[in-house]
């Protein structure tokens, strides 16, 4: 066996990665979790359960829906359709093919169903199996997720955003005194199921409890209690305690003394011990709970109260006559003075009454007596009448309806989460499998509600993240699936009942179209399925990590109040407090924090390090908001000694409710993992975030997502250390799939021979086809560039190619430029930006934008449209860029109005002239009448054609251009196949050589003789095929050769088969939309240089528009002659309070000056003035310990490293744990600069120094997607609105500029009457006047007449619609 790791001299690429000087102090014990795993886990792991054997699938996602819907039986129970298993076929097209052909990337879902037919004996009713049929049924195509967590739907990349919604369960709250004028708090409870009817319970102003179902009319809560089967006695016994009053002759009543029921008050009568007769307190004296406890402790068990005390109390059981057992008063009735007389007359010794006092109000008892329903039947009928008004109420229907509402698992589902929340809130212990309401639930909800009213317990905070959960992709699609399958179930039952079941197969019963349409509708039109923001890799990642409170089942913008949008203490480490849109969606759309993840119940968890006995361990525990409330959590920057023990007397900790307290170190349970866990990915890319005002940080994180990928990428000198993670997880860069050695590299692809050998010992080959100048969703350019060279050894997950906006495996959204903060002739007024001509000349901020144009040749009523070069009435000059088929060449430079694809459409028949009749009579065939319908470049677009794609309908003959494109693609596929085969062959034959050399020949081709010993020279004389003809004496060697041959042939066949499949796909034609014969797509790339009007921004929310481009010689320059690139306004800082940008500028200034210093040292080393030790010493001083592994290498490698940082030293200053002001000063000193970071600047125009020192430094600036080229527009001739006949507005409608009300005032103020008249008539909507004016311009005359504007006629018509006839009458005078 040959080891492939032999002779690897190349260094692993990971040494190629950029080293940053890191200012962080906190050691990271947890890596940032994969940034898009929220999408992938939810869909692939939890919903589809792809790549999991059928037997090992858990009952969740698709499996659980199919299990819950099936089995389906018909009404007579003769046929029964059961679910066995499901699996996915391979998708017809891969991701790339789908996006090119405008198809959806989906896999066919095959479900195995079993249909059982039963025979039912009509006399006995027994059932016997008549037959069982099992069949695999196609249930439609299910969209698959790409490796980057997106979906391809009709050729466009889409993202399904996760939704935040209220967790199922029970919630208690009050109206904050807003409903009733007295400001009284009205408490209410609401049971929110995952699906099913909502149940509300509420108090009114009179303290009566009501309930309502699905916001319908309210009923007494006791009606609900009776409906679940409770009698009056059970209700009273469940909600109240009872106390017995015993008669003491001639003295009054003795009653048990309960100190808990005593509140502080003045006694109205003496407090007398019933057992001893002692007076403990006199009337008028004050009793307190403390005093009551003291008396109780001293043996006070019963007290004596006056006879009249019973008046106003409520009976806790029926009052009966001792002699006849006749009921005198019902349970719950109030004791009146008359009733007390009866009690005395009948000498009743014991009276049981309810304990009702300020701690336990009479609400349930009052509701009972207000409620007219006295039994279960009446209560059920009452509920039925509210929910089904107008239908006759009978007890059976009412019972069914009530059961179906809350107790039927088909219609009501609390979900596992809802059951857990319900159990914990109501202190119940019901199994998690019970996901419907139970009688205990309802009884206890009323109990907790009453306790809240009595002042026990607290209301729920609905914005607490323990009460809001996340529905990710998998769950959202699962809900759609359920809807589709429920609809399908109905159609299956109908089909079972309709036909002869004996002859039917499962596929005859299932109509997959119902399911497909529901899923398709969700992906195409749902508010949560969104067109992916693909401006740059950061915007992609952020979009996938977004949490929206909007969407179906969520909030709506108009109704969301301030509380929902606000930052909540539980957001800490879960939802970013910074990143959210400005405008009406603020706070409703959020971003997940960097380290957060979503647990199986849908709650967001944040990681913490466990603290045991003051000792901070490396154990990382993820806690949800609910669990977090139980612990004391310290901050990540708490002081820790070298043994990992917390230092200091007290530690600042977070406790329940988001409050901060100082606790002793041994009481701390956890500390944060890193300060960065608070913010989102975008915010964690802002260096010195801690020095910025929150509003500006918000703008900064939002604007990074709008940065356009530039031609030349450049990672920031001042970063945060997260740049690499973002580039890797976004999928923009290409990662190596296995360890291996680079065999071939060019700009289009990388071929790597892997080192992970197969079972047969042969290597596999990874071929990475790079994306070249592809269009993104936002018309920016996706282009990948290789980072490796032939012979490089790469490790798994190394970055081997950069994508858009990445530089050496780090995200690079903008460029490092030299800025000066200085007012310059008013050109940087109000955040304007002044730039040097160098920036434009050297393409520093130049970006490429790609637009796609499509033309479809259809089959029309009058005949097919044709793509051709032969277009009527078009000059040869206009056709110069088209090939013989009529499609533009790749590489052609085009501008607005040029023809991209020539197309003609048949014209309708016009009346035939006599001459034509004659011609037709002579020649028979009429000259075919066509009109030009070519695709032209729209206005405002110019550029170079970079790609053309031609799609032809199956069965339609392909044109030459389509064949040429197809040939090119086949050649590419063949090259991939041949290269892979070549690498495998090279390996196989070198292995064969090693086996054969030294063996004795038994038989072989003509050139060799039996008995010879094989040498390498002999083998060189043989062709590759002749190797297999050799037979040698050693049987073991022959066996091995036989095995190699088998494996080699298998590999070769597999490659050929794969090639053949792909070629067949290319040649077979395309599935085009209805009626389309041919589709041509043309891609035009435009270079956008920076120009006045373009918007730029830094990472700190400092945005501005370019006001002027100044020649280099006029720009301010440094004393060494370096010209400043950009001049910014210093007044943009103080009021905005984003000081982070100044610290960034200073550190950037240190960065380039340190780089200059390193370059000088290298120069001196090369001139032999200094040794390598001085360079090492300087690098050690600069980078610290983490550079040791480079300093231990050879001198050449150290110099090579120094050359890499010759442009600027890269820093990492992590969020909230980065460089302090002193660190920045230290770096400036090390670079030999003034610690103030300010320098003398010279004015380029006068050559004189500016009066004061100026802050100058390297700053990272971004070019945003708001380009002036796409905004500015003017109209000459264009469309008019149908009703008002005024020109349309806006660039997309090619509209005009509105001359509005205020503009009219301006003309009126100047008295420019004629100008005003023409503005309001012929230049706008006087139709006849417009035509006449056009005529007079054509004739060269200068006069015009204005008539009545069309909008005046519209107004008159509106008057008439109001029955007012307004006429314009011209009188003769």
From Swiss-Prot:
SUPFAM superfamilies according to UniProt: beta and beta-prime subunits of DNA dependent RNA-polymerase
UniProt keyword annotations, A-Z: DNA-directed RNA polymerase, Nucleotidyltransferase, Transcription, Transferase
GO BP: any one term: DNA-templated transcription
Reactions performed catalytically: RNA(n) + a ribonucleoside 5'-triphosphate = RNA(n+1) + diphosphate
Any one Gene Ontology cellular component term annotated for this protein: DNA-directed RNA polymerase complex
CDD domains, A to Z: RNA_pol_B_RPB2
UniProt xrefs under InterPro entries: DNA-dir_RNA_pol_bsu_ext_1_sf, DNA-dir_RNA_pol_bsu_external_1, DNA-dir_RNA_pol_su2, DNA-dir_RNAP_su2_dom, DNA-dir_RNAP_su2_hyb_sf, RNA_pol_bsu_bac, RNA_pol_bsu_CS, RNA_pol_bsu_protrusion
Cited Gene3D superfamilies: 2.40.50.100, 2.40.50.150, 3.90.1100.10, DNA-directed RNA polymerase, beta subunit, external 1 domain (2.30.150.10), DNA-directed RNA polymerase, subunit 2, domain 6 (2.40.270.10), RNA polymerase alpha subunit dimerisation domain (3.90.1800.10), RNA polymerase Rpb2, domain 2 (3.90.1110.10)
GO molecular function: DNA binding; DNA-directed RNA polymerase activity; ribonucleoside binding
PROSITE patterns for the chain: RNA_POL_BETA
EC numbers for this chain: 2.7.7.6
Pfam families assigned: RNA_pol_Rpb2_1 (PF04563), RNA_pol_Rpb2_2 (PF04561), RNA_pol_Rpb2_3 (PF04565), RNA_pol_Rpb2_45 (PF10385), RNA_pol_Rpb2_6 (PF00562), RNA_pol_Rpb2_7 (PF04560)
Function: DNA-dependent RNA polymerase catalyzes the transcription of DNA into RNA using the four ribonucleoside triphosphates as substrates.
Stated family: Belongs to the RNA polymerase beta chain family.
Assembly and binders: The RNAP catalytic core consists of 2 alpha, 1 beta, 1 beta' and 1 omega subunit. When a sigma factor is associated with the core the holoenzyme is formed, which can initiate transcription.
HAMAP family associated with the record: RNApol_bact_RpoB (MF_01321)
UniProt-recorded name of the protein: DNA-directed RNA polymerase subunit beta
């Amino acid at each position: 066996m040959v080891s492939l790791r032999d002779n690897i001299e190349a260094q692993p690429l990971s040494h190629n990665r950029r080293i940053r000087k890191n200012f962080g102090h906190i050691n990271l014990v947890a890596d940032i979790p994969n940034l898009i795993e929220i999408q992938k886990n939810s869909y692939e792991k939890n919903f589809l359960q792809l790549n999991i054997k059928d037997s090992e699938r858990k009952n969740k996602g698709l499996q659980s829906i199919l299990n819950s819907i099936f089995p389906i039986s018909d009404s007579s129970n003769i046929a029964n359709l059961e679910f066995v298993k499901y699996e996915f076929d391979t998708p017809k097209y891969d991701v790339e093919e789908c996006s090119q052909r405008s198809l959806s990337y989906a896999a066919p879902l095959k479900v195995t169903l079993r249909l059982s037919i039963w025979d039912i004996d009509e006399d006995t009713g027994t059932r016997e199996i008549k037959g069982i049929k099992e069949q695999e049924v196609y249930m439609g195509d299910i969209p698959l997720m790409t490796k980057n967590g997106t979906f391809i739907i009709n050729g466009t990349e889409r993202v399904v955003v996760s939704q935040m919604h209220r967790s199922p369960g029970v919630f208690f709250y009050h109206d904050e005194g807003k409903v009733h004028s007295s400001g009284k708090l009205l408490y209410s409870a609401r049971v929110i199921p995952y699906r099913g009817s909502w149940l509300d319970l509420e108090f009114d102003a009179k303290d009566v409890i009501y309930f309502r179902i699905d916001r319908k009319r309210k009923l007494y809560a006791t009606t609900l209690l009776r409906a679940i089967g409770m009698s009056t006695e059970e209700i009273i016994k469940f909600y109240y305690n009872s106390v017995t009053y015993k008669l003491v002759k001639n003295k009054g009543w003795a009653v048990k003394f309960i100190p808990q029921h005593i509140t502080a008050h003045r006694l109205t009568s003496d407090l007398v011990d019933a057992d001893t007769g002692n007076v403990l307190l006199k009337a008028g004296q004050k009793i307190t709970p403390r005093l009551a406890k003291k008396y109780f402790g001293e043996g006070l068990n019963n007290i004596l109260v006056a006879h009249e005390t019973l008046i106003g109390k409520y009976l806790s059981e029926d009052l009966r006559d001792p002699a006849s057992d006749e009921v005198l008063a019902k349970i719950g009735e109030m004791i009146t003075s008359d009733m007390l007389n009866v009690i005395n007359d009948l000498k009743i010794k014991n009276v049981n009454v309810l304990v009702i006092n300020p701690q336990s109000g009479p609400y349930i008892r009052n509701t009972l007596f207000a409620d007219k329903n006295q039994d279960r039947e009446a209560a059920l009928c009452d509920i039925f009448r509210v929910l089904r008004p107008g239908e006759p109420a009978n007890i059976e229907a009412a019972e069914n309806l009530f059961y179906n509402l809350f107790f039927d698992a088909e219609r009501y589902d609390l979900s596992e989460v809802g059951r857990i929340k319900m159990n914990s809130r109501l202190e119940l212990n019901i199994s998690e499998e019970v996901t419907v309401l139970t009688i205990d639930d309802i009884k206890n909800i009323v109990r907790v509600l009453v306790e809240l009213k009595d002042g026990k317990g607290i209301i729920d905070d609905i914005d607490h993240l323990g009460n809001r959960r996340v529905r990710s992709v998998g769950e959202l699609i699962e809900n759609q699936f359920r809807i589709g399958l429920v609809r399908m179930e109905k159609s299956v039952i109908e089909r079972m009942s309709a036909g002869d079941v004996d002859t039917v197969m499962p596929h005859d019963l299932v109509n997959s179209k119902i399911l497909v349409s529901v899923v398709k509708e969700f992906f195409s039109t749902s508010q949560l399925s969104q067109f992916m923001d693909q401006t740059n890799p950061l915007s992609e990642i952020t979009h996938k990590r977004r949490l929206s409170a909007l969407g179906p089942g969520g909030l709506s913008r108009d109704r969301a109040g301030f509380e929902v949008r606000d930052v909540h203490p539980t957001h800490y480490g879960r939802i970013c407090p910074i990143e959210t849109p400005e405008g009406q969606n603020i706070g409703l759309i959020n971003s997940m924090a960097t380290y957060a993840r979503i647990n199986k119940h849908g709650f967001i968890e944040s990681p913490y390090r466990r603290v045991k006995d003051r000792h901070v361990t490396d154990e990382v525990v993820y806690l949800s908001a609910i669990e977090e409330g139980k612990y004391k959590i310290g901050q990540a920057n708490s002081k820790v000694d070298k043994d990992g023990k917390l230092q200091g007397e007290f530690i600042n900790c977070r406790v329940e409710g988001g409050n901060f307290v100082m606790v002793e170190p041994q009481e701390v349970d956890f500390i944060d993992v890193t300060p960065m866990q608070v913010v989102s990915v975008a915010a964690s890319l802002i260096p010195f975030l801690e020095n910025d005002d929150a509003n500006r940080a918000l703008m900064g994180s939002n604007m990074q997502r709008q940065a356009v990928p530039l031609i030349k990428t450049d990672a920031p000198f001042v970063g945060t250390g997260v740049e690499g993670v973002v580039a890797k997880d976004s999928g923009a860069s290409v990662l190596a799939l296995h360890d291996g050695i680079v065999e071939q590299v060019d700009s289009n692809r990388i071929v790597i021979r892997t080192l992970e050998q197969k079972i047969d010992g042969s290597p596999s080959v990874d071929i990475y086809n790079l994306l070249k100048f592809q269009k993104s969703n936002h018309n920016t350019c996706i282009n990948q560039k290789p980072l490796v060279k032939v012979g490089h050894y790469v490790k798994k997950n190394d970055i081997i190619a950069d994508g858009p906006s990445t530089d050496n495996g780090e995200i690079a959204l903008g460029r490092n430029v030299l800025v000066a903060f200085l007012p310059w002739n008013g050109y940087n007024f109000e955040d304007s930006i002044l730039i040097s001509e160098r920036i434009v000349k050297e393409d520093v901020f130049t970006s490429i934008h790609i637009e796609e144009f499509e033309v479809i040749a259809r089959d029309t009523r009058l005949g097919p449209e044709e793509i051709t070069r032969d277009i009527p009435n078009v000059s040869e000059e206009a056709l110069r860029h088209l090939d013989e088929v009529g499609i533009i060449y790749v590489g052609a430079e085009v501008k607005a109005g040029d023809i991209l694809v020539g197309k003609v459409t048949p014209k309708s028949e016009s009346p035939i002239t006599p001459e034509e009749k004659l011609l037709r009579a002579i020649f028979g065939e009429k000259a075919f009448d066509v009109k030009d319908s070519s695709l032209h470049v729209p206005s405002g677009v110019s550029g170079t054609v970079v790609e053309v794609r031609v799609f032809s309908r199956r069965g339609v003959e392909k044109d030459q251009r389509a064949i040429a494109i197809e040939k090119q693609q086949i050649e590419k596929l063949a090259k991939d196949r041949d290269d892979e085969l070549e690498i495998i062959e090279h390996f196989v034959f070198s292995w064969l050589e090693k086996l054969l050399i030294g063996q004795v020949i038994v038989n072989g081709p003509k050139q060799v003789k039996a008995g010879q010993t094989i040498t390498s020279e002999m083998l060189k004389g043989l062709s590759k095929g002749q190797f297999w003809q050799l037979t040698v004496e050693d049987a073991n060697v022959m066996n091995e050769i036989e095995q190699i041959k088998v494996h080699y042939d298998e590999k070769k066949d597999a490659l050929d088969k794969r090639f053949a499949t792909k070629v067949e796909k290319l040649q077979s034609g395309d599935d085009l939309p209805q009626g389309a014969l041919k589709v041509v797509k043309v891609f035009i790339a435009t270079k956008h240089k920076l120009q006045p009007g373009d918007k730029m921004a830094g990472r700190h929310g400092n945005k501005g528009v370019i006001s002027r481009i100044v020649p280099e010689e006029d720009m301010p320059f440094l004393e060494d002659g370096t010209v400043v690139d950009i001049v910014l306004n210093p007044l943009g800082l103080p009021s905005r309070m984003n000081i982070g940008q100044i610290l960034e500028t200073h550190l950037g200034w240190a960065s380039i000056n340190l780089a200059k210093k390193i370059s000088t040292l290298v120069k001196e080393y090369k001139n032999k003035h200094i040794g390598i030790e001085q360079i090492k010493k300087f690098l050690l001083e600069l980078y610290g310990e983490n550079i040791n592994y480079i300093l231990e290498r050879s001198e050449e490698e150290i110099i090579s490293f120094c050359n890499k940082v010759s442009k600027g030293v890269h820093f990492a200053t992590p969020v909230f744990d980065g460089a302090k002001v002193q660190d920045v000063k230290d770096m400036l000193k090390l670079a030999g600069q003034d610690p103030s970071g300010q320098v003398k600047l010279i004015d380029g125009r006068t050559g004189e120094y500016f009066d004061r020192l100026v802050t100058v430094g390297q700053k990272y600036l971004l070019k945003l997607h708001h380009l002036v080229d796409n905004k500015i527009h003017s109209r000459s001739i264009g469309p008019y609105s149908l009703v008002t006949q005024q020109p349309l507005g806006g660039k997309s409608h090619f509209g005009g500029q509105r001359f509005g009300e205020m503009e009219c005032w301006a003309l009126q103020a100047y008295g420019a009457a004629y100008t005003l008249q023409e503005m309001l008539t012929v230049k706008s909507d006087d139709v006849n006047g417009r035509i006449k004016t056009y005529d007079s311009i054509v004739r060269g005359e200068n006069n015009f007449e204005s008539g009545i504007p069309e909008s005046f006629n519209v107004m008159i018509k509106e008057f008439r619609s109001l029955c007012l006839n307004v006429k314009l009458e011209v009188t003769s005078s």
